[in-house]
C-alpha cells in the first residue's frame, strides 16, 4: 500500500493511484489544523438530536461555512491538484461516524454509481477520507478492491439486510473479496480514492468509535447538473477557473433550504430513492 507524507506526490505514487485507485497519505493537515477540525467535529456530533444517526452527517458545509477552513485548505488543494488538475471544485463533504457496537455497514459499491445523475462524468471525482479516530479492521475500516476503478461495467441489487447505510449494493458476483485490502488509518492520516473504486466497510462491532471526514472534489471540467438538482445540491469553486459552465455556490453563505430539500440521511438525489 503506497503511503506519502510530503506535499508533492512522486511519479511512483501517482502511478500507484492510477493503477490501484487509491493512496494513503500519512499527514493531510498540520497538527494545529487537525486538532481544530477534531474539536469542531466533536461539537457537531454532540449537537445531534437522538433521532439523528452519526453516519448521516452528510454535506455539513451547506449549513456550516466554517468547514471551508479545511475544505479549501491550501495543502489539501495542492494534493488534489496533482490528481485532477489545477481547476478544482468542491463536490461534497461528509462526517461519517460509526459508534461502537452500533455503527452501520457500508456495502460494496462505487461512489460514481450514486452520483451518475449529479455529475458528468460521475467517475471523475476523488474522495479524501481523513481519519479523526483510529480506523482499524476491528472497528470497520474501509476495504478496497485495488484496480477495480478500471472496470466500468457494474450490476447493482437491492440490499435486503438491516443495518446498511445504502439501499443498493454491487452484485456479489462482481466482487472478489479475496482481493480486498483494509485501509487502516491513524488519526490525521487520510486515504484518497477514485469514484469508480469498489469499496465498503463492515459494521463497527468493537468498543471503539470510528469517525472520519470525507472531502470530495472534481475538476471544473466535470459538469454539475445544476438545472435538475441545484435545489438539492451545490458545488463550490475551490481553485482556478470554471471549465464547464457550472454554477457555484457562495462558501460564505449557509444553505439550509438545500438540506431541507434533500431529506434526512443518505440522499442520492435525482430519481433514486433514499437509502436506509
Give names to the regions the model predicted.
Residues 2, 45-47, 196-276:
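Non-heme Fe(II)/2-oxoglutarate
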Residues 110-111, 165-177, 209, 228-234:
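Short, surface-exposed loop/helix-turn segments at secondary-structure junctions
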Residues 29-31, 96-98, 113, 135-137, ...:
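Short, solvent-exposed loop/turn segments at secondary-structure junctions
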Residues 1-119, 157, 228, 237-241:
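Non-heme Fe(II)-dependent double-stranded beta-helix
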Residues 86-93, 104-106, 124-130, 140, ...:
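Generic beta-strand structural signal
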Residues 109, 118-137, 184-186, 192, ...:
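Short, conserved beta-strand element in jelly-roll/cupin
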Amino acid at each position: 500500500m503506497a503511503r506519502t507524507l510530503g506535499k508533492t506526490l512522486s511519479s511512483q505514487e501517482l502511478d500507484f493511484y492510477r493503477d490501484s485507485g487509491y493512496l494513503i497519505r500519512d499527514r493531510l493537515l498540520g497538527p494545529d489544523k487537525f486538532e481544530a477540525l477534531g474539536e469542531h467535529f466533536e461539537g457537531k456530533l454532540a449537537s445531534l438530536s437522538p433521532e439523528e444517526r452519526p453516519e448521516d452527517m452528510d454535506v455539513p458545509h451547506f449549513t456550516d461555512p466554517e468547514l471551508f477552513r479545511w475544505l479549501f485548505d491550501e495543502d489539501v488543494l495542492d494534493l488534489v491538484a496533482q490528481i485532477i488538475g489545477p481547476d478544482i471544485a468542491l463536490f461534497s463533504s461528509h462526517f461519517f461516524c460509526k459508534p461502537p457496537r452500533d455503527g452501520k455497514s457500508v456495502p460494496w459499491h462505487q461512489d460514481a454509481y450514486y452520483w451518475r445523475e449529479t455529475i458528468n462524468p460521475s467517475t471523475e471525482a476523488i474522495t479524501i477520507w481523513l481519519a479523526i479516530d483510529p480506523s482499524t479492521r476491528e472497528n470497520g475500516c474501509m476495504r478496497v478492491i485495488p484496480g477495480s476503478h478500471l472496470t466500468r461495467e457494474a450490476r447493482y441489487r437491492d440490499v435486503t439486510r438491516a443495518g446498511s447505510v445504502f439501499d443498493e449494493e454491487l452484485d456479489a458476483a462482481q466482487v472478489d473479496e479475496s482481493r480486498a485490502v483494509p485501509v487502516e488509518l491513524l488519526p490525521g492520516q487520510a486515504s484518497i480514492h477514485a469514484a469508480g473504486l469498489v469499496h465498503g466497510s463492515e459494521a463497527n462491532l468493537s468498543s471503539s468509535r470510528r469517525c472520519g471526514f470525507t472531502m470530495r472534489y472534481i475538476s471544473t471540467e466535470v459538469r454539475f447538473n445544476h438545472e435538475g438538482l441545484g435545489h438539492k445540491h451545490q458545488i463550490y469553486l475551490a481553485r482556478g477557473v470554471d471549465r464547464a459552465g457550472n454554477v457555484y455556490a457562495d462558501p460564505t453563505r449557509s444553505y439550509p433550504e438545500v438540506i431541507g430539500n434533500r431529506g434526512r440521511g443518505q440522499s442520492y438525489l435525482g430519481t433514486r430513492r433514499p437509502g436506509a
